[in-house]
Each structure stands twice: as C-alpha cells, then as structure tokens.
Amino acid sequence: MSGLSLKECVPCRGGVPPLTGEEIAKLLPELDGWEVVNEHHLKKSYRFSNFREAQVFVNRVGDLAEEQGHHPDICFGWGNAEISIWTHKIDGLTESDFILAAKIDKL
C-alpha cells in the first residue's frame, strides 16, 4: 500500500520542527485507517476476537518498535488495542511516526 513501510525510522535528536499540517495531509493518505489528533499524534484502534489475540498483536508491535527505535503508546484490553504515535522529543509528528504506523499495519 505505502512506500512508507519500506523506510526505516530515523532517531530524533530534538531541535527539529514537527511536521506542518500540509506535510501531515500529504502523508496521511498513505496510511490505512489512522487518524491525526490535533496535528500532534497518530491514533488507530484495532479489534480482536479475544484478549490473547490483542496481546499477541501488542507484543509484535513492541518488537517492531524496538527494532525501529521508535516507540508508540499502547493501550489494550479484551479484544482491543489502541496505538498512539508521536515523536516525544519534539512533542509532535515526524515522518518516522508515519513510517512506524505503516509498518504496524503490515504486521
């Protein structure tokens, strides 16, 4: 679906500006079902048949996050998981957030 999933997340050292609304609008169509909240973070909810499926998914996301060196906020429970992604060092969105979201969708 997206070339974003083929890229690698780049570590943010801070001091860079977050993406603008225009830049976000160009990247968002490359993602499937993600929403942008207040031009600050990406968010997506997932549904599963039971707790175990949600847990397995969350563990896979955690492994991916470690590989990429870019870590989302994850909340999950019986049959659901919610992922929020932003670059904490700049308290906003970077291309790496979109890359991670695209990679999560390929799991």
Task: Label every PLM stretch briefly.
Residues 1-32, 37-107:
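Long, contiguous binding/interaction regions
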